[in-house]
Protein backbone atom coordinates (compact mmCIF):
# COMPACT_ATOMS: atom_id res chain seq x y z
CA UNK A 1 0.00 0.00 0.00
CA UNK A 2 1.22 3.49 -0.83
CA UNK A 3 2.10 5.72 2.13
CA UNK A 4 -1.21 7.37 3.22
CA UNK A 5 0.70 10.59 3.93
CA UNK A 6 1.55 10.81 0.23
CA UNK A 7 -2.08 10.33 -0.72
CA UNK A 8 -3.18 12.98 1.78
CA UNK A 9 -0.55 15.60 1.13
CA UNK A 10 1.10 14.92 -2.25
CA UNK A 11 -1.44 13.36 -4.58
CA UNK A 12 0.29 15.05 -7.52
CA UNK A 13 3.54 13.23 -6.63
CA UNK A 14 1.63 9.94 -6.56
CA UNK A 15 0.08 10.64 -9.95
CA UNK A 16 3.47 11.55 -11.42
CA UNK A 17 4.79 8.14 -10.33
CA UNK A 18 1.72 6.23 -11.47
CA UNK A 19 1.97 7.89 -14.90
CA UNK A 20 4.74 5.37 -15.69
CA UNK A 21 2.08 2.67 -15.34
CA UNK A 22 -0.48 4.57 -17.37
CA UNK A 23 -2.58 4.99 -14.22
CA UNK A 24 -3.97 8.25 -12.88
CA UNK A 25 -5.98 8.97 -9.74
CA UNK A 26 -8.87 11.41 -9.60
CA UNK A 27 -7.20 14.30 -7.78
CA UNK A 28 -10.49 16.02 -6.97
CA UNK A 29 -11.99 12.83 -5.56
CA UNK A 30 -9.01 12.29 -3.24
CA UNK A 31 -9.02 15.97 -2.25
CA UNK A 32 -12.72 15.70 -1.40
CA UNK A 33 -12.14 12.57 0.69
CA UNK A 34 -9.31 14.28 2.56
CA UNK A 35 -11.42 17.40 3.20
CA UNK A 36 -14.23 15.26 4.59
CA UNK A 37 -11.78 13.33 6.75
CA UNK A 38 -10.25 16.51 8.16
CA UNK A 39 -13.68 18.04 8.85
CA UNK A 40 -14.87 14.93 10.69
CA UNK A 41 -11.60 14.68 12.61
CA UNK A 42 -11.85 18.34 13.61
CA UNK A 43 -15.51 17.99 14.59
CA UNK A 44 -14.76 14.95 16.73
CA UNK A 45 -11.85 16.65 18.49
CA UNK A 46 -13.89 19.81 19.21
CA UNK A 47 -16.74 17.77 20.66
CA UNK A 48 -14.31 15.80 22.81
CA UNK A 49 -12.75 19.04 24.07
CA UNK A 50 -16.22 20.44 24.86
CA UNK A 51 -17.10 17.26 26.75
CA UNK A 52 -13.89 17.42 28.77
CA UNK A 53 -14.49 21.08 29.64
CA UNK A 54 -18.08 20.30 30.61
CA UNK A 55 -16.97 17.46 32.86
CA UNK A 56 -14.70 19.84 34.76
CA UNK A 57 -17.51 22.37 35.03
CA UNK A 58 -19.88 19.73 36.41
CA UNK A 59 -17.31 18.80 39.01
CA UNK A 60 -16.89 22.39 40.12
CA UNK A 61 -20.66 23.00 40.33
CA UNK A 62 -21.24 19.84 42.36
CA UNK A 63 -18.35 20.75 44.63
CA UNK A 64 -20.00 24.09 45.40
CA UNK A 65 -23.39 22.41 45.95
CA UNK A 66 -25.02 23.78 42.78
CA UNK A 67 -27.34 22.16 40.21
CA UNK A 68 -25.42 20.67 37.26
CA UNK A 69 -28.35 18.85 35.63
CA UNK A 70 -28.56 21.21 32.64
CA UNK A 71 -24.88 20.85 31.84
CA UNK A 72 -25.05 17.07 32.37
CA UNK A 73 -27.89 16.84 29.87
CA UNK A 74 -25.76 18.76 27.41
CA UNK A 75 -22.88 16.38 28.09
CA UNK A 76 -25.17 13.45 27.28
CA UNK A 77 -26.11 15.04 23.97
CA UNK A 78 -22.45 15.76 23.19
CA UNK A 79 -21.62 12.13 23.94
CA UNK A 80 -24.19 11.00 21.38
CA UNK A 81 -22.75 13.45 18.83
CA UNK A 82 -19.24 12.14 19.47
CA UNK A 83 -20.36 8.54 18.91
CA UNK A 84 -22.03 9.50 15.63
CA UNK A 85 -18.98 11.49 14.49
CA UNK A 86 -16.62 8.64 15.38
CA UNK A 87 -18.74 6.15 13.43
CA UNK A 88 -18.81 8.47 10.41
CA UNK A 89 -15.05 9.02 10.66
CA UNK A 90 -14.38 5.29 10.95
CA UNK A 91 -16.55 4.53 7.91
CA UNK A 92 -14.83 7.23 5.88
CA UNK A 93 -11.36 6.05 6.89
CA UNK A 94 -12.34 2.51 5.88
CA UNK A 95 -13.56 3.80 2.50
CA UNK A 96 -10.26 5.64 1.99
CA UNK A 97 -8.25 2.55 2.99
CA UNK A 98 -10.18 0.29 0.61
CA UNK A 99 -9.52 2.73 -2.24
CA UNK A 100 -5.85 2.92 -1.26
CA UNK A 101 -5.57 -0.89 -1.30
CA UNK A 102 -6.47 -0.84 -5.00
CA UNK A 103 -3.70 1.60 -5.97
CA UNK A 104 -0.56 -0.07 -7.41
CA UNK A 105 2.94 0.61 -6.14
CA UNK A 106 4.93 3.57 -7.41
CA UNK A 107 7.64 2.56 -9.93
CA UNK A 108 11.26 3.24 -9.04
CA UNK A 109 12.84 6.13 -10.93
CA UNK A 110 14.97 3.62 -12.89
CA UNK A 111 11.85 1.94 -14.33
CA UNK A 112 11.00 3.01 -17.90
CA UNK A 113 7.55 4.36 -18.64
CA UNK A 114 5.45 2.17 -20.91
CA UNK A 115 2.13 0.53 -21.56
CA UNK A 116 2.90 -3.18 -22.02
CA UNK A 117 5.58 -5.77 -22.85
CA UNK A 118 6.43 -3.95 -26.07
CA UNK A 119 7.93 -1.15 -23.97
CA UNK A 120 10.14 -3.41 -21.84
CA UNK A 121 13.91 -3.02 -22.11
CA UNK A 122 16.28 -5.90 -22.84
CA UNK A 123 19.23 -5.71 -20.44
CA UNK A 124 21.32 -8.70 -21.52
CA UNK A 125 21.39 -12.14 -23.12
CA UNK A 126 23.19 -15.29 -22.01
CA UNK A 127 23.96 -18.33 -24.14
CA UNK A 128 23.43 -19.03 -27.82
CA UNK A 129 20.29 -20.83 -28.99
CA UNK A 130 21.17 -24.26 -30.34
CA UNK A 131 21.05 -24.80 -34.10
CA UNK A 132 19.39 -28.15 -34.75
CA UNK A 133 20.24 -30.25 -37.82
CA UNK A 134 16.96 -32.17 -37.62
CA UNK A 135 13.27 -31.32 -37.40
CA UNK A 136 12.58 -30.54 -33.75
CA UNK A 137 9.54 -31.46 -31.68
CA UNK A 138 7.88 -29.28 -29.09
CA UNK A 139 7.78 -30.51 -25.49
CA UNK A 140 4.20 -31.72 -25.84
CA UNK A 141 5.06 -34.04 -28.73
CA UNK A 142 8.27 -35.15 -27.02
CA UNK A 143 6.45 -35.95 -23.78
CA UNK A 144 3.60 -37.79 -25.46
CA UNK A 145 6.05 -39.78 -27.61
CA UNK A 146 7.91 -40.81 -24.45
CA UNK A 147 4.63 -41.69 -22.72
CA UNK A 148 5.45 -39.48 -19.75
CA UNK A 149 3.34 -36.36 -20.37
CA UNK A 150 -0.41 -36.85 -20.42
CA UNK A 151 -2.88 -34.01 -20.91
CA UNK A 152 -5.89 -36.19 -21.75
CA UNK A 153 -5.57 -38.05 -18.45
CA UNK A 154 -5.35 -34.75 -16.56
CA UNK A 155 -8.43 -33.47 -18.39
CA UNK A 156 -10.30 -36.62 -17.36
CA UNK A 157 -9.18 -36.23 -13.76
CA UNK A 158 -9.76 -32.49 -13.44
CA UNK A 159 -10.15 -30.41 -16.60
CA UNK A 160 -8.15 -28.34 -19.05
CA UNK A 161 -4.83 -26.66 -18.20
CA UNK A 162 -3.65 -29.53 -15.99
CA UNK A 163 -1.03 -32.20 -16.72
CA UNK A 164 0.12 -35.62 -15.54
CA UNK A 165 3.81 -36.57 -15.54
CA UNK A 166 4.98 -40.18 -15.31
CA UNK A 167 8.21 -42.12 -15.26
CA UNK A 168 11.47 -40.41 -16.24
CA UNK A 169 9.78 -37.04 -16.87
CA UNK A 170 8.27 -37.03 -13.38
CA UNK A 171 11.71 -37.86 -12.00
CA UNK A 172 13.30 -35.12 -14.12
CA UNK A 173 10.87 -32.57 -12.69
CA UNK A 174 11.76 -33.74 -9.18
CA UNK A 175 15.46 -33.50 -10.05
CA UNK A 176 15.01 -29.91 -11.21
CA UNK A 177 13.23 -29.02 -7.97
CA UNK A 178 15.91 -30.61 -5.80
CA UNK A 179 18.70 -28.96 -7.78
CA UNK A 180 17.08 -25.53 -7.42
CA UNK A 181 16.53 -25.92 -3.68
CA UNK A 182 20.03 -27.28 -3.09
CA UNK A 183 21.57 -24.39 -5.04
CA UNK A 184 19.60 -21.72 -3.20
CA UNK A 185 20.08 -23.19 0.28
CA UNK A 186 23.62 -24.59 0.08
CA UNK A 187 25.17 -21.98 -2.21
CA UNK A 188 23.07 -18.81 -2.11
CA UNK A 189 22.32 -18.60 1.60
CA UNK A 190 18.55 -19.14 1.70
CA UNK A 191 16.72 -21.01 4.45
CA UNK A 192 14.40 -23.68 3.09
CA UNK A 193 10.77 -23.29 4.12
CA UNK A 194 7.82 -25.65 3.92
CA UNK A 195 4.50 -23.79 4.03
CA UNK A 196 0.73 -24.41 3.89
CA UNK A 197 -0.78 -24.46 0.42
CA UNK A 198 -3.89 -22.80 1.86
CA UNK A 199 -3.84 -19.25 3.22
CA UNK A 200 -6.38 -16.89 4.73
CA UNK A 201 -7.55 -13.60 3.27
CA UNK A 202 -5.30 -11.55 5.58
CA UNK A 203 -2.23 -13.17 4.02
CA UNK A 204 -3.42 -12.35 0.50
CA UNK A 205 -4.18 -8.77 1.49
CA UNK A 206 -0.72 -8.51 2.96
CA UNK A 207 1.03 -9.40 -0.28
CA UNK A 208 -1.43 -7.52 -2.49
CA UNK A 209 -3.52 -10.19 -4.23
CA UNK A 210 -6.63 -9.04 -2.36
CA UNK A 211 -8.86 -7.20 -2.78
CA UNK A 212 -8.04 -6.33 -6.39
CA UNK A 213 -7.25 -9.75 -7.90
CA UNK A 214 -9.66 -12.17 -6.26
CA UNK A 215 -10.84 -13.47 -9.65
CA UNK A 216 -7.33 -14.87 -10.26
CA UNK A 217 -7.52 -17.02 -7.12
CA UNK A 218 -9.06 -20.38 -6.25
CA UNK A 219 -11.21 -20.01 -3.12
CA UNK A 220 -12.38 -22.97 -1.08
CA UNK A 221 -16.04 -23.39 -0.23
CA UNK A 222 -16.84 -23.99 3.43
CA UNK A 223 -16.80 -22.35 6.83
CA UNK A 224 -13.18 -21.19 6.58
CA UNK A 225 -12.18 -18.41 4.18
CA UNK A 226 -9.20 -20.23 2.68
CA UNK A 227 -7.54 -19.76 -0.70
CA UNK A 228 -5.10 -21.95 -2.62
CA UNK A 229 -1.79 -20.13 -2.89
CA UNK A 230 -0.97 -18.52 -6.26
CA UNK A 231 2.72 -18.52 -5.28
CA UNK A 232 4.86 -19.32 -2.22
CA UNK A 233 5.52 -15.58 -2.03
CA UNK A 234 2.22 -15.25 -0.16
CA UNK A 235 2.81 -17.51 2.87
CA UNK A 236 6.56 -16.92 3.05
CA UNK A 237 6.41 -13.11 2.93
CA UNK A 238 3.66 -13.19 5.54
CA UNK A 239 6.08 -14.80 8.00
CA UNK A 240 6.84 -11.21 9.09
CA UNK A 241 3.28 -9.86 9.13
CA UNK A 242 2.57 -7.98 12.39
CA UNK A 243 6.18 -8.54 13.46
CA UNK A 244 8.96 -6.23 14.64
CA UNK A 245 12.29 -7.77 13.63
CA UNK A 246 15.60 -6.97 15.29
CA UNK A 247 17.82 -5.18 12.77
CA UNK A 248 20.68 -7.64 13.25
CA UNK A 249 18.46 -10.48 11.94
CA UNK A 250 18.17 -8.86 8.51
CA UNK A 251 18.31 -9.87 5.75
CA UNK A 252 15.96 -12.84 6.00
CA UNK A 253 16.23 -15.12 2.96
CA UNK A 254 13.86 -18.01 2.31
CA UNK A 255 13.40 -20.53 -0.50
CA UNK A 256 10.28 -22.67 -0.80
CA UNK A 257 9.02 -25.24 -3.28
CA UNK A 258 5.24 -25.35 -3.64
CA UNK A 259 2.55 -25.99 -6.19
CA UNK A 260 0.93 -22.76 -7.35
CA UNK A 261 -2.74 -22.43 -8.26
CA UNK A 262 -4.08 -19.76 -10.62
CA UNK A 263 -7.41 -19.40 -12.37
CA UNK A 264 -5.72 -17.67 -15.35
CA UNK A 265 -8.69 -15.32 -15.65
CA UNK A 266 -8.40 -13.29 -18.82
CA UNK A 267 -6.04 -15.74 -20.55
CA UNK A 268 -8.70 -17.62 -22.53
CA UNK A 269 -7.23 -18.90 -25.78
CA UNK A 270 -3.60 -18.15 -24.81
CA UNK A 271 -1.02 -20.95 -24.58
CA UNK A 272 -3.64 -23.69 -24.58
CA UNK A 273 -1.07 -26.30 -25.65
CA UNK A 274 1.56 -27.68 -23.32
CA UNK A 275 2.98 -26.65 -19.97
CA UNK A 276 3.36 -22.89 -20.48
CA UNK A 277 0.10 -21.83 -18.80
CA UNK A 278 -1.41 -24.22 -16.25
CA UNK A 279 -3.91 -23.88 -13.41
CA UNK A 280 -1.47 -25.84 -11.22
CA UNK A 281 2.31 -25.67 -11.56
CA UNK A 282 5.34 -26.09 -9.32
CA UNK A 283 7.74 -23.29 -8.52
CA UNK A 284 10.73 -22.69 -6.30
CA UNK A 285 10.30 -19.21 -4.85
CA UNK A 286 12.92 -16.95 -3.30
CA UNK A 287 11.89 -14.29 -0.76
CA UNK A 288 14.08 -11.70 0.92
CA UNK A 289 13.18 -9.36 3.81
CA UNK A 290 15.71 -6.54 3.98
CA UNK A 291 16.48 -3.05 5.23
CA UNK A 292 15.26 -0.28 2.88
CA UNK A 293 18.74 0.94 1.96
CA UNK A 294 19.78 -2.51 0.69
CA UNK A 295 16.69 -3.52 -1.29
CA UNK A 296 17.88 -2.50 -4.76
CA UNK A 297 21.17 -4.33 -4.22
CA UNK A 298 19.14 -7.31 -2.98
CA UNK A 299 17.09 -7.27 -6.21
CA UNK A 300 20.26 -7.58 -8.28
CA UNK A 301 21.44 -10.44 -6.04
CA UNK A 302 18.13 -12.29 -6.13
CA UNK A 303 17.91 -11.96 -9.92
CA UNK A 304 21.47 -13.25 -10.25
CA UNK A 305 20.50 -16.30 -8.19
CA UNK A 306 17.70 -17.10 -10.65
CA UNK A 307 20.09 -16.53 -13.55
CA UNK A 308 22.56 -18.91 -11.94
CA UNK A 309 20.08 -21.78 -12.20
CA UNK A 310 19.57 -21.14 -15.92
CA UNK A 311 23.31 -20.87 -16.51
CA UNK A 312 24.03 -24.10 -14.61
CA UNK A 313 21.43 -25.85 -16.78
CA UNK A 314 22.95 -24.36 -19.94
CA UNK A 315 19.66 -22.76 -21.02
CA UNK A 316 19.90 -19.60 -23.16
CA UNK A 317 17.92 -16.71 -21.73
CA UNK A 318 17.55 -12.97 -21.74
CA UNK A 319 17.06 -10.47 -18.91
CA UNK A 320 14.32 -7.87 -19.28
CA UNK A 321 13.62 -4.71 -17.27
CA UNK A 322 9.85 -4.31 -17.16
CA UNK A 323 8.26 -0.97 -17.96
CA UNK A 324 5.77 0.57 -15.57
CA UNK A 325 2.72 -0.70 -17.42
CA UNK A 326 3.89 -4.34 -17.46
CA UNK A 327 4.96 -4.58 -13.81
CA UNK A 328 2.99 -6.46 -11.21
CA UNK A 329 0.64 -4.57 -8.91
CA UNK A 330 2.93 -4.45 -5.88
CA UNK A 331 6.34 -4.09 -7.55
CA UNK A 332 8.48 -0.99 -7.62
CA UNK A 333 11.02 -2.64 -9.98
CA UNK A 334 10.98 -5.99 -11.79
CA UNK A 335 13.33 -8.04 -13.93
CA UNK A 336 11.93 -10.90 -16.00
CA UNK A 337 14.10 -13.77 -17.19
CA UNK A 338 12.95 -15.35 -20.43
CA UNK A 339 14.25 -18.76 -21.51
CA UNK A 340 14.74 -19.80 -25.13
CA UNK A 341 11.99 -22.14 -26.38
CA UNK A 342 13.16 -23.70 -29.69
CA UNK A 343 9.75 -24.84 -30.92
CA UNK A 344 8.42 -21.29 -30.63
CA UNK A 345 11.66 -19.69 -31.83
CA UNK A 346 11.37 -17.12 -29.08
CA UNK A 347 12.06 -16.39 -25.40
CA UNK A 348 9.34 -17.07 -22.80
CA UNK A 349 9.15 -15.91 -19.19
CA UNK A 350 10.56 -18.36 -16.68
CA UNK A 351 11.26 -16.07 -13.73
CA UNK A 352 10.04 -12.73 -12.44
CA UNK A 353 12.14 -11.01 -9.76
CA UNK A 354 10.68 -8.00 -7.99
CA UNK A 355 11.51 -5.42 -5.35
CA UNK A 356 8.25 -4.51 -3.63
CA UNK A 357 9.79 -1.74 -1.51
CA UNK A 358 7.67 -1.07 1.59
CA UNK A 359 4.41 -1.68 -0.32
CA UNK A 360 3.72 -5.12 1.16
CA UNK A 361 5.31 -4.29 4.51
CA UNK A 362 2.88 -1.41 5.06
CA UNK A 363 -0.07 -3.71 4.37
CA UNK A 364 1.40 -6.38 6.65
CA UNK A 365 2.64 -3.98 9.37
CA UNK A 366 6.06 -5.62 9.05
CA UNK A 367 8.79 -3.55 10.66
CA UNK A 368 12.31 -3.79 12.00
CA UNK A 369 13.74 -2.19 15.12
CA UNK A 370 16.37 0.44 14.33
CA UNK A 371 17.01 1.30 18.00
CA UNK A 372 15.22 1.14 21.35
CA UNK A 373 12.54 3.63 20.31
CA UNK A 374 12.38 3.73 16.51
CA UNK A 375 10.99 1.17 14.07
CA UNK A 376 10.76 1.30 10.27
CA UNK A 377 9.01 -0.72 7.59
CA UNK A 378 11.10 -3.48 6.01
CA UNK A 379 11.40 -3.94 2.25
CA UNK A 380 10.30 -7.23 0.67
CA UNK A 381 11.50 -8.97 -2.49
CA UNK A 382 10.51 -12.13 -4.28
CA UNK A 383 11.52 -14.06 -7.37
CA UNK A 384 11.03 -17.38 -9.14
CA UNK A 385 14.03 -19.57 -8.84
CA UNK A 386 12.57 -21.08 -11.09
CA UNK A 387 9.14 -22.04 -12.41
CA UNK A 388 9.69 -25.81 -12.50
CA UNK A 389 7.28 -26.79 -15.29
CA UNK A 390 8.63 -24.17 -17.67
CA UNK A 391 12.18 -25.21 -16.80
CA UNK A 392 11.24 -28.82 -17.57
CA UNK A 393 9.88 -27.92 -21.00
CA UNK A 394 12.95 -25.78 -21.71
CA UNK A 395 15.26 -28.69 -20.86
CA UNK A 396 13.17 -31.09 -22.96
CA UNK A 397 13.23 -28.87 -26.03
CA UNK A 398 16.79 -27.54 -25.81
CA UNK A 399 18.30 -30.95 -25.00
CA UNK A 400 16.24 -33.11 -27.38
CA UNK A 401 18.00 -35.54 -29.72
CA UNK A 402 17.01 -36.65 -33.19
CA UNK A 403 15.67 -40.01 -31.98
CA UNK A 404 13.29 -38.26 -29.55
CA UNK A 405 15.33 -38.92 -26.43
CA UNK A 406 16.42 -36.09 -24.12
CA UNK A 407 19.94 -35.51 -22.88
CA UNK A 408 20.09 -34.78 -19.16
CA UNK A 409 22.02 -31.60 -18.22
CA UNK A 410 25.18 -32.53 -16.35
CA UNK A 411 24.16 -30.81 -13.09
CA UNK A 412 21.00 -32.93 -12.92
CA UNK A 413 22.64 -36.31 -13.46
CA UNK A 414 23.40 -36.93 -9.76
CA UNK A 415 19.65 -36.52 -9.11
CA UNK A 416 18.83 -38.95 -11.93
CA UNK A 417 20.91 -41.88 -10.71
CA UNK A 418 23.77 -40.97 -13.05
CA UNK A 419 21.67 -41.32 -16.21
CA UNK A 420 22.80 -39.22 -19.17
CA UNK A 421 19.57 -39.31 -21.17
CA UNK A 422 15.92 -40.37 -20.96
CA UNK A 423 13.67 -41.81 -23.65
Swiss-Prot record:
Gene Ontology terms: biological process = selenocysteine biosynthetic process; seryl-tRNA aminoacylation
Residues recorded as binding ATP, renumbered to this chain, are 262-264, 349-352
Per UniProt, subcellular location reads as: Cytoplasm
Fetch the PROSITE patterns from UniProt.
AA_TRNA_LIGASE_II
Keyword field: Aminoacyl-tRNA synthetase, ATP-binding, Cytoplasm, Ligase, Nucleotide-binding, Protein biosynthesis
Q: Which GO terms describe its molecular function?
A: ATP binding; serine-tRNA ligase activity
What protein name applies here? Serine--tRNA ligase
Taxonomic lineage of the native organism: Bacteria, Pseudomonadati, Pseudomonadota, Gammaproteobacteria, Moraxellales
